[in-house]
């Protein structure tokens, strides 16, 4: 087909292409015509930059479509993207990159879908179709990434005149964004707007969710009078300083102005108004400080107030402190008095452990308050928290930390509010008020973090008697929680319940969302029969181990039993039955392992090998594998790293699509081999295959399936070996290594299947009536001269087969 390529100069180039051509091929054709090297070309279609490894059909580029050619400026530039958690991502970009391209790069690095990303620069939200240069984003600029919470909400803004404005916002919108929306509606410049909520002035860089502003909340809009106001600051010597300020100035700003006038460092200043010490992060308006108010300046004298610290031995220590002292300072004072190093001290007040960077006033610790000192056992311990995306967070904790403390540490690291966190250990959800030691959580234990999705859903549980139970659950509920709900309804103890979904037994510690169980899904409940059975495990040395098991035991359970008997760690065990490697999450009954069956135990050699997986975006993933790993195992590892479900992955090596049940060694995949990962487009399509007998076979395929794959599907359905199959479409025989899209085979196309007979061959004879006859023949020994009698015999054969054939010879 023909397509057009339009340059920025207005010139249009015509190219002859096929839908199966890659973008790389198209760039090569442009180079042939125009002499522009491919690495300087960027092709745009429908507002998207096209990736080299994808095909024209991937982007639905059809005949006479027009692509836009943008020249890649040599060098590009780096920009930074800062997340709300404080993490900074570095991206290689060009000024001509669209915001959509930038979001795609962030997805490649962080796995965040573009539709959940909002990018902010200079207080403005960036639009997908615009470029970096449109926003004057230059090298080393910093963008801010805000996650788009699904849904949005309405809030109200009330002015001093009584008018109420309705705004469509998201919790992640910054105050600056909100002011821009008000400007769009009312024409009031943002720098003249002050927004108040719950008595506080809102700061531009913070988000609505930072202030817990929820749907239908009402903000108050106050216009900022140009020029500000005067206040006075009186020192203990009686001197009065005059300052020009605004109600929205923070106490920190005021101290800076005092430093400018008087040279007193801010950390030595304490400002008092109406008998209260003013905190740095608050504003003058927070304290109702108005024009011509007088503040009192007190120099921070070493001393302040007394507090008490009580040790576990009952000893009480008296300390001289100030409300602005940090917990770190207090620990240093305790070290001075008692010789206990700060890293071994834990201070408790009102039941909470105090954090080093916070101040006494942050915790409302006042004069003569009593803190409790607990000695930190040397080093504490590390635990790991694994999220559903596969990310693992490391935390420094102590056995006496509460679950609430742990959630606070996760919030500090990841920015996830505690009320959205659910922590799971050993299949149990952990309660806020309990400690790690209450749950026997020890060093290097792994907790699982599940985000609490708002709302909940209904699912159904069907028993073998046909009864259906309805349960109210959340996607983040564990299977153990679900079994407890079933016990509440039906009285069946959890240890007698086995839950099945999509043919798999569900494990206690996993969640409903782990298994993609959605609203109104149906689980099947099977009762666990008491009793069990014996199986045998044979090692390579010939030793046979006897195990007591149940059909519902997982392979993981079996490995644990082997470890108990033989001391071999589960991660070094590979169990084989009927020639297949058994997967940890499956059960014995899944593999039809019955009483007195024999499994074979192979030790997993340490080290394995590395292979690489290259995606269509050019990203390369490194995996640690073993030759005996199945393709299914490899896909699971890719899911752990990249979050791509196995059923959307297709792996290609040496031009062949790899089958789940086969191993890497089956395909001769060795260390440092590179596999290619193609994403399986959702939906696929149906095609028909018509045999010479008139039978029509229906196949589920994808445009990217190779002819070899199609033949394998035919073998699965009809038992015909691929090497005996010849597929015909549009009069052409299809080649194994090509794909359906290469031949423009679309949904509901019909292929013709011809059997390849060993030794001979088939030919077709078309009659004048249009009928086609198939003949089994052998190649002539002498193809240059065909004897007349051979011709006569051949045509007589044809005449017998089809009397309507108009056959003649000379």
From Swiss-Prot:
Give the top-rank taxon of the lineage listed in the UniProt record for this protein.
Eukaryota
- Covalent cross-link (Glycyl lysine isopeptide (Gly-Lys) (interchain with K-? in acceptor proteins)), residues: 76
Write down which residues bear the modification named Phosphoserine: 65, 141
Can you tell me where the transmembrane regions are?
none
Keywords, ordered alphabetically: ADP-ribosylation, Cytoplasm, Isopeptide bond, Membrane, Mitochondrion, Mitochondrion outer membrane, Nucleus, Phosphoprotein, Repeat, Ubl conjugation
Per its UniProt record, what CDD domains does this chain match?
Answer: Ubl_ubiquitin
What Pfam family does this protein match (any one)?
ubiquitin
Q: Where in the chain is the site Interacts with activating enzyme?
A: 130, 148
**Which location does the Swiss-Prot or TrEMBL entry give for the cross-link Glycyl lysine isopeptide (Lys-Gly) (interchain with G-Cter in ubiquitin)?**
6, 11, 27, 29, 33, 48, 63
Which InterPro entries is this protein grouped with?
Ubiquitin-like_dom, Ubiquitin-like_domsf, Ubiquitin_CS, Ubiquitin_dom, Ubiquitin_ubiquitin-like
Domain annotation Ubiquitin-like: ranges: 1-76, 77-152, 153-228, 229-304, 305-380, 381-456, 457-532, 533-608, 609-684, 685-760
Which positions does the site annotation Essential for function cover? 144
Provide the positions where the record notes the PTM ADP-ribosylglycine.
76
* Gene Ontology biological process terms from the UniProt entry: modification-dependent protein catabolic process; protein ubiquitination; ubiquitin-dependent protein catabolic process
| GO MF annotation list | protein tag activity; structural constituent of ribosome; ubiquitin protein ligase binding
- Among the entry's GO cellular component annotations, what is one? cytoplasm
Remarks, miscellaneous? Ubiquitin is encoded by 4 different genes. Uba52 and Rps27a genes code for a single copy of ubiquitin fused to the ribosomal proteins eL40 and eS31, respectively. UBB and UBC genes code for a polyubiquitin precursor with exact head to tail repeats, the number of repeats differ between species and strains. For the sake of clarity sequence features are annotated only for the first chain, and are not repeated for each of the following chains.
Q: Which PANTHER family match?
A: UBIQUITIN (PTHR10666)
What is this protein called in UniProt? Polyubiquitin-C
List the source organism. Rattus norvegicus
